[in-house]
Amino acid sequence: MEVDFYIPDDELAIQVSYSIEGSDTTEKREVEALQKLPKTLSCKRRVIITYDEEKTIEDEYGMIEVIPCWKWLIQQ
């Protein structure tokens, strides 16, 4: 399992990809890494930061947020 960033104090996992749409392999790789994480680490929030895509992906552990970079930056 590999994620781009994990912030233990916030229990936040982040994947970064320019785009996850249009490529089944890219989306699968980015999402699967975040889906496996809660099995080994405590994780309250899972995020994929993209250039301009936005959606939510639900799984057995809750939601994975897909958000554009600009939106993630103004939230911080």
Model-based region annotation:
Residues 1-76:
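A cross-kingdom feature that marks ATP-driven nucleic-acid transaction machinery
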